[in-house]
Swiss-Prot record:
It comes from Nitrosomonas europaea (strain ATCC 19718 / CIP 103999 / KCTC 2705 / NBRC 14298). Gene3D superfamilies: Aldolase class I (3.20.20.70). This is Biotin synthase. Homodimer. The keyword 4Fe-4S applies. One of its GO terms (biological process) is biotin biosynthetic process. Binds 1 [4Fe-4S] cluster. The cluster is coordinated with 3 cysteines and an exchangeable S-adenosyl-L-methionine. The gene is bioB. GO terms for molecular function: 2 iron, 2 sulfur cluster binding; 4 iron, 4 sulfur cluster binding; biotin synthase activity; iron ion binding.
Length: 337
């Protein structure tokens, strides 16, 4: 069997039927890039019908989890991710901020819970945590966990043993996105290798932490590259329990500012492909919702998205306010998990 953290090629595997046992088990490579391209090429209504059918087999079709994301350390990152306003080398207006205190994080988590969120995510802008950062994070994770919330952290590249410390503190999920397909990755990031990301996912799995791993669409990638991203995710063994799909938020000062915007229906197609290929996962409608019409968000839910980030800010970019989200839920007959 291939390693769960080896890169796949287009001809390595063929598509399993989405309703078959082999499509659910994470025991072997299941989805080729060509097979996922075939999904993305389907007539829109056929693709959405297939995704909704799979979604209803494994999830409450009208339930959406509310997650809140906070930046515990903002700005000054040494990486060169072309989409990120927190990279120190870009002039985006994002100022470096001192790491939040434990009390500030707990206060934010408490407010999120009172607003209806059940999941609290903490992100930090650095290449990877030092030991003192891990010690800080274990304190805040334990404190947030004590509130009865599901916890997630996105802290960059992990060294051996760090994931175990986070697990012992009560961390439920670790987020480390692949961002895009390996073939397109070098166009977006040069300061870390694709394999670095896969190695961190291996550390997370080894510590028995749930994996939160997805990507960004609208980076200027081709449809084949979007299929390649979904193939990489779906063929992890097992595939991630949580799959955030982000629509690029263009920030002035980053290299990707001014990139032609992706057709939003292509974003919906990507959500549908994620749902079909990873039927048990939470598919998270993540960054970019503020620029989406309500009708497009509704189509994303129909395509199998069952989580949103809730609150007026995602790290450093805007997000729909909570009242708008609750009003949309009422229109669509959705309820919070």
């Amino acid at each position: 069997m291939e390693s769960a953290t080896s890169l796949i090629s287009e001809k390595q595997c063929e598509c399993a039927h989405p309703n078959s046992d082999s499509a659910v088990q994470g025991s072997s490579l299941r989805w080729s890039i060509a097979a996922i391209e075939s999904l993305l090429d389907l007539p829109f209504s056929d693709l959405i019908f297939q995704a909704q059918t799979v979604h209803r087999q494994y999830h409450d079709a009208n339930a959406v989890q509310l997650s809140t994301l906070i930046s515990v350390k903002t700005g000054g990152c040494s990486e060169d991710c072309a989409y990120c306003p927190q990279a120190a080398r870009y002039h985006t207006g994002v100022e470096n901020q001192a790491i939040l205190s434990r009390e500030e994080v707990v206060a934010a988590a408490t407010q999120a819970k009172e607003s209806g969120a059940t999941r609290f995510c903490m992100g930090a802008a650095w290449r990877g945590p030092k030991q003192r950062d891990i010690e800080y994070m274990t304190e805040v994770i334990s404190a947030v966990k004590a509130l009865g919330m599901e916890t997630c952290a996105t802290l960059g590249i992990l060294k051996p043993g760090q994931a175990t410390q986070l697990k012992q503190a009560g961390l439920d999920y670790y987020n480390h996105n692949l961002d895009t397909a390996p073939e397109f990755y070098g166009e977006i990031i040069t300061t870390r290798e694709y394999q670095d990301r896969l190695d961190t996912l291996e550390e997370v799995r080894g510590a028995n932490i749930n994996v939160c791993c997805g990507g960004i669409v609208g980076l200027g990638e081709s449809r084949m590259a979007r299929a390649g991203l979904i193939a990489q995710l779906a063929n992890l063994d097992p595939y991630p329990e949580s799959v955030p799909i982000n629509y690029l938020v263009q920030v002035e000062g980053t290299p990707l500012y001014g990139t032609p915007e992706l057709d939003p229906f292509e974003f919906v197609r990507t959500i549908a492909a994620a749902r079909i290929t990873m039927p048990k996962a939470m598919v998270r409608l993540s960054a970019g919702r503020r620029q989406m019409p309500e009708a497009i968000q509704a189509l994303c839910f129909l395509a199998g998205a069952n989580s949103i980030f809730y609150g007026d800010k995602l790290l450093t970019t805007g997000n729909p306010d909570t009242e708008k989200d609750l009003a949309l839920f009422e229109k669509l007959g959705l309820h919070a998990l």
